[in-house]
Amino acid sequence: MALLELERISAQYPGASTPVLADINLSLGPRQLLVALGPSGSGKTSLLNLIAGFVAPSGGHITLDGVPVQGPGAERGVVFQDDALLPWQNVLGNVAFGLELAGVPRAQREAKAREMLTLVDLDGFGERRIWQLSGGQKQRVGLARALAADPRVLLMDEPFGALDAFTREQMQELLLQVWQRTAKPVFLITHDIEEAVFLASELVLLAPNPGRVVERLQLNFGQRYAAGESARAIKSDPAFIETREHVLARVFSQRQSLQERA
């Protein structure tokens, strides 16, 4: 049974001649890690913003647990590419910030924040200031903050796009560990093909102008990592390489088609 449902979603900016998104149908079920991948102009971020409730669709319906999404809500935790952390708060204060706004007593919210810091391998970092953290550590704090409110769904907007290659791989592996431990459904958007293939239990390929779904792939590479197989072994598996090359060819053909129409 799906927790999150998108039915015939369309989106168009005022004054634009072409919709950003057209006829998008998606569902996110329990323990699923759904990744949306596509070139620039395919509407990835617009799609996440619709699910988060930051903007309303031009057409169609979005429901979470059968309830229409009509704005932002604590049941949807969001992790952004830019860490969006509060520089005047320490790490613990950042993770606990949403709980503070919700009126959770201090002792309870700090205990929850420390629990989430342990989950993302930042034990002992609670008193550090944001400027003392590396890029990867900031993203761990952002992930811990999103999880602290115990959302029904975790939304991730190209969360590792600004990180160096080594840190990006570390964060991908951490996300799979957190996903396995918490059983939270995740909707993640990315432009990184290898990342998408490695993480996704379902991979949705988007084409641009207007953004639309052109292919869906059911994958298990992330589940294999979560079950204990090494990332290196998975990424050298011929099945992984074949899938990555197939997705690369599809994305390349979309970009080429877009250039020919320009």
UniProtKB/Swiss-Prot annotation:
Keyword Oxidoreductase: no
Protein source organism: Pseudomonas putida (strain ATCC 47054 / DSM 6125 / CFBP 8728 / NCIMB 11950 / KT2440)
Membrane topology reported for the UniProt record: Peripheral membrane protein
Alphabetized CDD domains for the sequence: ABC_NrtD_SsuB_transporters
Alphabetically ordered keywords of this record: ATP-binding, Cell inner membrane, Cell membrane, Membrane, Nucleotide-binding, Translocase, Transport
Role according to the record: Part of the ABC transporter complex TauABC involved in taurine import. Responsible for energy coupling to the transport system.
Compartments where located: Cell inner membrane
GO molecular function: ABC-type taurine transporter transporter activity; ATP binding; ATP hydrolysis activity
InterPro entries the UniProt entry points to: AAA+_ATPase, ABC_transporter-like_ATP-bd, ABC_transporter-like_CS, ABC_transporter_ATP-bind, P-loop_NTPase
Gene for this chain: tauB
Enzyme class: translocase
Protein name: Taurine import ATP-binding protein TauB
